[in-house]
């Protein structure tokens, strides 16, 4: 019984500590998901709609647009 009470108190304390020390920039929930909101307005902006390149297709090392994620001028494997 004492252990259960201690666990409940610990969880309540950690929850209160999390809310007390959370960084609130003054906007609250306004800018919580700005990118997701932009993607809802413009579905083409979503990364899920972008096509990845298959093996042996030319790729850009900096954009990492290969399906496998390995690019050495051409997508590997």
UniProtKB/Swiss-Prot annotation:
Q: Where in the cell is it found?
A: Secreted
Keywords from UniProt, A to Z, are:
Calcium channel impairing toxin, Cleavage on pair of basic residues, Disulfide bond, Ion channel impairing toxin, Knottin, Neurotoxin, Presynaptic neurotoxin, Secreted, Signal, Toxin, Voltage-gated calcium channel impairing toxin
Q: Which cysteines are joined by disulfide bonds?
A: 52-67, 59-71, 66-75
Task: Please give the chief subcellular localization of this protein.
Answer: secreted
Q: Name one Pfam family in it.
A: Conotoxin
Instruction: Please give the tissue specificity annotation from the record for this chain.
Output: Expressed by the venom duct.
Q: Name one GO molecular function term.
A: calcium channel regulator activity
A cellular component term from Gene Ontology for this protein is: host cell presynaptic membrane
The signal peptide here is: 1-22
Q: Propeptide positions, renumbered to this chain? A: 23-49
Family assignment from sequence similarity: Belongs to the conotoxin O1 superfamily.
Q: What does the entry's free-text domain comment contain?
A: The presence of a 'disulfide through disulfide knot' structurally defines this protein as a knottin.
Question: What is known about what this protein does?
Answer: Omega-conotoxins act at presynaptic membranes, they bind and block voltage-gated calcium channels (Cav). Specifically acts on L-type channels. It blocks molluscan dihydropyridine-sensitive calcium channels.
The name this protein goes by in its record:
Omega-conotoxin TxVII
Which organism is this protein's natural source?
Conus textile (Cloth-of-gold cone)
Q: What is the lineage of its organism?
A: Eukaryota, Metazoa, Spiralia, Lophotrochozoa, Mollusca
């Amino acid at each position: 019984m004492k252990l259960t009470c201690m666990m409940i108190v610990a969880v309540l304390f950690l929850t209160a500590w999390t809310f007390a020390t959370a960084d609130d920039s003054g906007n609250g929930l306004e800018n919580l998901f700005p990118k997701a909101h932009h993607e809802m307005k413009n579905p083409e902006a979503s990364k899920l709609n972008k096509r990845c390149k298959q093996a042996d297709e030319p790729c850009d090392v900096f954009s990492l647009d290969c399906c496998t994620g390995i690019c050495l001028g051409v997508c590997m494997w």
